[in-house]
């Protein structure tokens, strides 16, 4: 599932990774990520 696109909320998408970069936020428990984290940046 590494590299899969994950949807956070309207207009914000992330990418599934085992570990997120320090400048990115992490959302755990997303089905599409199959146990990985969804790493994303907010646009504001």
Swiss-Prot record:
CC annotations in GO: extracellular region
Key words, A-Z: Alpha-amylase inhibitor, Disulfide bond, Pharmaceutical, Secreted
Location of the region described as Inhibitory motif in the Swiss-Prot/TrEMBL record: 7-10
Annotated localization: Secreted
Cysteine pairs bridged by disulfides in the record: 6-38, 16-33, 20-39
GO MF: alpha-amylase inhibitor activity
Additional remarks: A synonymy between H.magnifica and R.crispa is controversial.
Record remark on domains: Is structurally homologous to beta-defensins.
Annotated function: Mammalian alpha-amylase (AMY2A) inhibitor. The recombinant peptide inhibits porcine pancreatic (Ki=0.17 nM) and human saliva alpha-amylases (Ki=7.7 nM). It does not show antimicrobial (tested on fungi and bacteria) or channel modulating activities (tested on 18 voltage-gated sodium and potassium channles).
Annotated family: Belongs to the sea anemone alpha-amylase inhibitor family.
Listed name of the protein: Alpha-amylase inhibitor magnificamide
Lineage, uppermost ranks: Eukaryota, Metazoa, Cnidaria, Anthozoa, Hexacorallia
């Amino acid at each position: 599932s590494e590299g899969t696109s994950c949807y956070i909320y309207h207009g914000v998408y992330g990418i599934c990774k085992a570990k997120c970069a320090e400048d990115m936020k992490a959302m755990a428990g997303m089905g599409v990520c199959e146990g990985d984290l969804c790493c994303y940046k907010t646009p504001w």
